Amino acid sequence: EFRQRDPSPSFRWVKDGKQFGEVLSESGTLTPHPTMDLHFYQGTYRCYAANELGTAVSNLVHLTTEPVPSLAKVKKQKRRAYEVGESAVLRCNPPKSSVTPKIHWMDMQFHHIPLNERVTISRDGNLYFANLIANDSRDDYTCNAHYINASIILPKEPMSIYVTPSNSVVKNRRAKLHHPAGARSSYLVLRGQTLTLQCIPEGLPTPEVHWDRIDSALSPNRTKKLYNNRWLQIDNVLESDDGEYVCTARNSENSVKHHYTVTVEAAPYWTRSPEEHLYAPGETVRLDCKADGIPAPNITWSINGVPVSGTDVDPRRRVSSGKLILSNVEFSDTAVYQCEAVNKHGSILINTHVHVVELPAQILTPDERLYQATAGQTVMLDCRTFGSPLPKIHWEILDSIPALSNAKISQTTNGSLKISNVSEEDSNRYTCSVSETNKSISADVEVLNRTKIVGPPQNLHVIRGSDAILHCKYTVDHNLKSPTVQWNKDGHKITASTSNDKYHEIEGSLKVLDVQMEDMGIYSCEVSTTLDSDTASGYITVQDKPDPPQSLKLSEKMERSVTISWMPSVENNSPVTEYVIEMNEGETPDEGQWQKYRSVSQDIDSWRSICSYSKYHFQIRAVNSIGTSAPTESSLSYSTPAAKPDTNPENVMTLSTDPKSMIISWQEMDRRQFNGPGFQYKVFWRRAADSGAHWTESSVSNPPLMVNNTGTFVSFEIKVQAVNDLGAAPEPLTVIGYSGEDFPLEAPSALSVTELQKTSVMVRWSPVRPESVRGHLLGYKIYLRMKGSQWETPGRAVSSSGNPTVIEVPADAAEKIVSDLQFYSDYTLTITAFNSKGEGPHSEESFSTPEGAPGPVLFLPFDSPSESEITLRWEAPHKPNGEIRGYLLQYQEVVIGSESPQHVESIDLPAVTEFTLKNLNPESRYTFHLSARNDAGDGAPAIQSGATLLDGEPPSVINMTAGETSVNLSWVPGDRHRNLGFSFRYLKKIEGAEWEESEKINSTQAFYQLQGLDSGVIYHLQVLSGNTSYDWDFKTIYSPEWHKSPRNFATEGWFIGLISALVLLLLVLLLLCYIKKSKGGKYSVKDKEEGQGDAANQKLKDDAFGEYRSLESDMEKCSISQPSGCESKRSSNDSLADYGDSVDIQFNEDGSFIGQYSGRRDPRGHDSSGAVSPVNPNMPPPSHSFPTSVTGILGPN
């Protein structure tokens, strides 16, 4: 068949080198004549197609004719008898044909005979039995030959096999080969064909077949194993398949081999074919034609079907190394040139058209084409031309620089410009021009950044059932569109989406859900743009706990040992670290409790400590870093015979509590140590003093055993033996035990107490006689009880009924140091001996401890009556450790960078708890050290620091925030200043207005609100305190509603006065009730002092705190609406009144208190001026910048 040419060609056929038939004009198809014998047409054909431009020639066609295959008449085969295990061959021998038929072995119902390792078919159609079984007996083995080209199936005569039982003693048969015969065979195969090697064995048991290649490894990609490994097939054979192959057939009896020598040759095939072009007169034409084959083919040339001889008369033509060279071509050289390659396996022919013509040059590639590429790629700039002679083109960069001057740039034979490994500097305009013409085109090259994966997927180890996330981070040139990210697993595309149950793709990352073993593999991320792509991959290794161990076996079964073995587990990508042997001693594996017996690292273990008369069930688990496997699918059981006990019970002892009996006890033996039925404990005992006496014995099933009438604390020899129905254990060890103990009869004598230090004494005694202990002497107990402190008054003495301190000492001790006693206290001490029954009589002794230095005093908040005075207050030490004789006060001025002189004041009155220091520097702080004194010396000092308070002053800087009918006034109180009373005066700046004045205000209050002002009016404000005054102006906010609405009666003066009177009356009634309720009450501090102080000290404290109560009563009589009166009353009292309001002030860890003076009150004080009143009813919330009430500045500094 030829490509159609213009003008239309004529066709003629040549058969076996001679003209065959007439010349055909319309079609080259050759049709046989129906009356002619087909055998007449058998031969080798070649077709010639010719027109004005030349003659083309076809490849050789070989036509073979043959009659339709048919079966010859044959005699019916006799039924053949075989023994079980013998081999057999049923031969097909189909009619011969040029095309091998396909063979089907079937029965009479057209069911295929099953093929397996034992029953195999060969390429020649024979049916082979490696060994026969009884089921192979049948009468309808039929070979059906299917001729596909003839479309017929020829069934041969059925064959019969009868299989009888074997009488042979030998049960197995050695392996050998049915087909092929011998030890070696050779095969010749052509390149591109299919090679099939057969290895059909016989033997019992059925042999296994294994294929190998001698000279190299057998490639799994190039070979296929068919018919249960009996055929080895290689499709599309290559020269590399040439070599030696071997088949090994093996069963339990032996192995047999067959070697195959495969030789690969090849019919001719093209490696280079000539190209068709248009040529101009005078050009040189080179037609290059190369072919390969085994053996190497011979190449010849023809022109229009006429061979070119080696001595061509035309000197312009010559053949060299398969090339046909035409020099200085003319129009008459237009023709079809044939190149033909021939070897013994066939021939191939190719036609090449040479057209000599003159045509003007043209550029076929469009102008202004843009080429985009990424760095590192190769760019091909097209410049396709047409013309004869062939146009000569050249390239320039920016219309001036020759392109070929760049080492990276080359020009192909078709005129294209090749730029290799492009970079950013290659981004330019390139011009292609045709020489000796004005024709040219331009092309632009734009080089972009490469697409690059900067964060490739990582290799992950994932536990089965969890999720895995593979990240793929990349960079792309901003001039390119968003890339596509494609994930692949083992080279196959993954379709990921948010709706996919397995794969989710999130911003380029791949999430694999619920990872299973089949998800393990190589995952690659491919980032693609319109210009380039990049690929990176990572591996997901799925880990899981191991599979259960397999093939659990018990071997070497002995009376007391057994060997356990098993097949190792599948590790599931995490190495097995150990195997756990579990044991169950129930009657069945479902009964009892599975327990861990031991862990081992290998897959075998010997257990050599099995108990007799026991049943064991075993199972194995494998352990890796992920977890523990399920147990082996089935457990194994092992029972041991009964035997005498091997051991006796341990820890035999006496646990007697009754003086006239003995309890013998021991540690019960494990049931597995019984070793047989009828297990009991046999207990023996006799007095230790009568070592030759007869043993008394008793048998019991479990401990303990009680022996009566033994006497008090008598020693016995005791032993316990294990017995069962098969006998007794070895002779047990004898131990010494005792009957029950009784209380000791005597107390330790010669008890004495000697003072070592002021708070420790040495206690000595004489030990009790051993016979009086009536048991094992466990030691002595010293009971220490404090009767009271000598410095306490009789009414406040500590009771001695509390629990005493108990000190135990060992039995061999005769003295003991008792420490940590209290100073100046009375003690009672007793001592007794004790055994396991209890304590004996006590010996008693009394003693006292001397005085010691007092404990520290407790500083209370102190006051500053003036700028140069401080009054200190304190409580007496909680532990005086003697009689307090007075106090030592030391103080000094705090001077930074230097040491100031220290002042000392000795206070010789023990009942005094306050002291006033005068003539202090108001500008300095002081440190105070106060110690209590008794006859033993001075106690540890309490340390406090502080400074005096300065005189108060009214605020000079006020922050004002005006509203419609009020103004908020706030200020910052001075540091260390006393509270000072003052008031605000304010005046409307209108004609005829009069001054108004607020109530009295505390300087420490920090906030006040003037109410009842007119809207939109300017006011003048003054602060008055003594002869001091400060002035300000402010304006309230204008409110149209306030000016429009009539004055409500609630704002009238008479109504406000009425309401104020009612509120005042109610408050007076409440205060009277409170005063009546608290009348005669005592201050809690006084109650505390009454419980600890003496009568002389009590009188002074009652007088002092009486003043405090007077102040409190006076304050209660003050109205909340009259703070100025309260302030006046308070300031007229002495300094102790300020102390009364400061009892809640706290102390720091170093002893200094936080709110130091009454001028800085605790928020719970009683004299706050910020209480709601008819004049000042709405207090604003606290501010972080300024205190908003009097309580805001009374707290800690």
UniProtKB/Swiss-Prot annotation:
SS bond partners: 92-143, 199-247, 289-339, 383-432, 472-525
Region (Disordered): 630-655, 1115-1135, 1154-1197
Chain ranges on the Cytoplasmic side, renumbered to this chain: 1076-1197
Localization annotation: Cell membrane; Cell projection, Growth cone
Gene Ontology biological-process entries: axon guidance; axon regeneration; cartilage morphogenesis; cell-cell adhesion; nervous system development; positive regulation of axon extension; positive regulation of gene expression
SMART domains per UniProt: FN3, IG, IGc2
Stated name of the protein: Neural cell adhesion molecule L1.1
Annotated gene: nadl1.1
PROSITE patterns assigned to the protein according to its UniProt record, in alphabetical order: FN3, IG_LIKE
InterPro entries associated with the record: FN3_dom, FN3_sf, Ig-like_dom, Ig-like_dom_sf, Ig-like_fold, Ig_I-set, Ig_sub, Ig_sub2
Tissue/organ expression: Expressed in postmitotic neurons in 16-36 hours embryos, including those in the brain, cranial ganglia and otic and olfactory placodes, and in all classes of spinal neurons.
Any Pfam family hit: Ig_3
Native species: Danio rerio (Zebrafish)
Sugar-bearing residue positions: 135, 149, 221, 298, 414, 421, 438, 449, 708, 959, 968, 1002, 1027
